């Protein structure tokens, strides 16, 4: 049993820069929460709705890819490569 697909993968962008990578089961509420403490233009849903496991793996991989392309720096609002 794979677990249910209820998790969205997303990026927050400011201009053409990715400032945060995350996952959520409620994009609408999550976007409102992010607006309280982050400066970004839009929330972009990435790919298809996933299982939590699949989304978590994507999140770590996506942040690592970002870091590889940005001298080891995480996106502005990600504290570490696990998206926390």
Language-model regions, residue ranges each:
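Structure-specific nucleic-acid interaction/processing domains
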Residues: 3-84
